Amino acid sequence: MAISQVANTGIPKGARVILFGSQARGDAKEGSDWDVLVLIDKERLSPSDHDLYSYPFWELGWKIDAMIHPAVYTLSDWNTKANPIFRTNVERDGIVLC
């Protein structure tokens, strides 16, 4: 799976990457998008962090003609500020890529 390869080699070490949504559940249809959660262990994200961690997934999407939507959070924000329903869905259905 190319998305797993990007997760393991295309983004800086230390990030936790989780595939979620229909692709993770196995009920994706042709043309379904890919949803990826990127968790960063730092206090605050800068605009350049969003680009640094998102761009490799966007680039893969352009290459394979697929929509890949990375959601980038600090661990702290994920645990305290992320929508609880979103968190529950990721925790239930997510596949850890790295």
Placement of each model-derived feature along the sequence:
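Catalytic core of pol beta-like nucleotidyltransferases
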Residues: 1-18, 24-30, 41-98
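Short beta-strand->loop micro-motif that forms the acidic, two-metal-ion catalytic signature
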Residues: 34-39
